[in-house]
């Protein structure tokens, strides 16, 4: 039987949920404007900050990130179905479709955001250690330079360097598409950097598949997410190169 039906269903769910851009109805409801027509014209959390302020921007960022977590939870639910069609449902692969949906949403004529918040959600699902590192690096550079695009690019580059080390997953060796044997050793020692992957242990108890997403799957998913971020930040990269990128908040002038 085809054991990957769960991946297909969860990926479709992820794309459709990813296509929900919370910044659009929120800016319309709070200020009565279209986010596509004000600020940077981008329907993301950063532009929401410019239009509505930090609190609403944070709310949009959290809602966008939760789209990935909800999709992962949906995939977990499918993997618990005691049927071979769902026995090898990946929790990682469907999450990348949330980023695709966010950037090219079917509900908004394929005009989406830049998926930084969704990428953070992806890191939480694949390896929350990467999320913490990205988050720290992002805030350091955001505080110093006040440029979201620069902070996102540097944070992404940092994860790109670290993610090739098996120890960052809590395992001693590299695993390919099925990482169950590698991760079960780490889980038994209570080393769980890939927390969502742990739910494969419970699904295995239901149908005995002994399947878990491997490091390679996680790395491929993160790499695809990085490519999406670079593509969506192409104009920002040009502005950074030309030193014309505007800070999200200008530095306050010191009183003399």
From Swiss-Prot:
Pathway: Lipid metabolism; phospholipid metabolism
GO terms for cellular component: plasma membrane
Top enzyme category: transferase
Cited InterPro entries: G3P_acylTferase_PlsY (IPR003811)
Subcellular localization: Cell membrane
Biological process according to GO: phospholipid biosynthetic process
Keyword Transmembrane: yes
EC number: 2.3.1.275
GO molecular function: acyl-phosphate glycerol-3-phosphate acyltransferase activity
Primary localization class, coarse: membrane
Pfam families reported in the protein's UniProt record: G3P_acyltransf
Top-level division of the source organism's lineage: Bacteria
Record key words, sorted: Cell membrane, Lipid biosynthesis, Lipid metabolism, Membrane, Phospholipid biosynthesis, Phospholipid metabolism, Transferase, Transmembrane, Transmembrane helix
Recorded topology in the membrane: Multi-pass membrane protein
Transmembrane portions of the chain: 2-22, 58-78, 90-110, 123-143, 153-173, 211-231
SMART domains referenced in this protein's UniProt entry, alphabetically: G3P_acyltransf (SM01207)
Reaction equation(s) it catalyzes: an acyl phosphate + sn-glycerol 3-phosphate = a 1-acyl-sn-glycero-3-phosphate + phosphate
Subunit composition and interactions: Probably interacts with PlsX.
Function, in words: Catalyzes the transfer of an acyl group from acyl-phosphate (acyl-PO(4)) to glycerol-3-phosphate (G3P) to form lysophosphatidic acid (LPA). This enzyme utilizes acyl-phosphate as fatty acyl donor, but not acyl-CoA or acyl-ACP.
Family: Belongs to the PlsY family.
Protein name as it appears in the record: Glycerol-3-phosphate acyltransferase
Gene source species: Mesoplasma florum (strain ATCC 33453 / NBRC 100688 / NCTC 11704 / L1)
Gene for this chain: plsY
